[in-house]
Amino acid sequence: MTSQVRQNFHQDCEAAINRQINLELYASYVYLSMAYYFDRDDQALHNFAKFFKNQSHEEREHAEKLMKVQNQRGGRIFLQDVKKPEKDEWGSGVEALESSLQLEKSVNQSLLDLHKVCSEHNDPHMCDFIETHYLDEQVKSIKELGDWVTNLRRMGAPQNGMAEYLFDKHTLGKEST
């Protein structure tokens, strides 16, 4: 059944939004895996766990926001299977942050691709939505993760376990307060 509210909403934009929803849910799933990995007794980096759990929640919210706009525009949501994370063991904190950085960069590229599709189909509403709610936040997140990886490497991580312990306690501990 065709939506009565659909206006200036190309099928390519609708399909690209559905792909982005799936990617955001995948990112949420990856971060959830990371969170509970660092919560294990043999890792015990509780602020890493808390950070990744918050990231998981944020990515799920991104997916839900896209679902809401899909409905508002008269599109249809077609959920796909969410791929399992690439790994079950995330290694050290710095290795997990490097994986997180790569994930955020791929999410950002996908958002840029979505923006391009919407722009090519003259959909200023969707372009504005992506710019307002996603792109700036992605750039800030990528910068923060890059800075953290640099600082952890500077302190000798992952070979120096004290570096990750102090980072967990002082840097990520401040993030969660």
Swiss-Prot record:
Keyword RNA-binding appears in the UniProt entry: no
Official protein name in the record: Ferritin, heavy subunit
Reported tissue expression: Liver, gonads, head kidney, heart and spleen.
Catalytically driven reaction(s): 4 Fe(2+) + O2 + 4 H(+) = 4 Fe(3+) + 2 H2O
Subunit organization: Oligomer of 24 subunits. There are at least two types of subunits. The functional molecule forms a roughly spherical shell with a diameter of 12 nm and contains a central cavity into which the insoluble mineral iron core is deposited.
Organismal lineage: Eukaryota, Metazoa, Chordata, Craniata, Vertebrata
Species whose genome carries this gene: Salmo salar (Atlantic salmon)
DNA-binding as UniProt keyword: no
Binding site for Fe cation 1: 24, 59, 62
Its job: Stores iron in a soluble, non-toxic, readily available form. Important for iron homeostasis. Has ferroxidase activity. Iron is taken up in the ferrous form and deposited as ferric hydroxides after oxidation.
InterPro entries: Ferritin, Ferritin-like, Ferritin-like_diiron, Ferritin-like_SF, Ferritin_CS, Ferritin_DPS_dom
Class of this enzyme: oxidoreductase
MF-aspect GO terms: ferric iron binding; ferrous iron binding; ferroxidase activity
CC terms in the record's Gene Ontology section: cytoplasm
Ferritin-like diiron domain location: 7-156
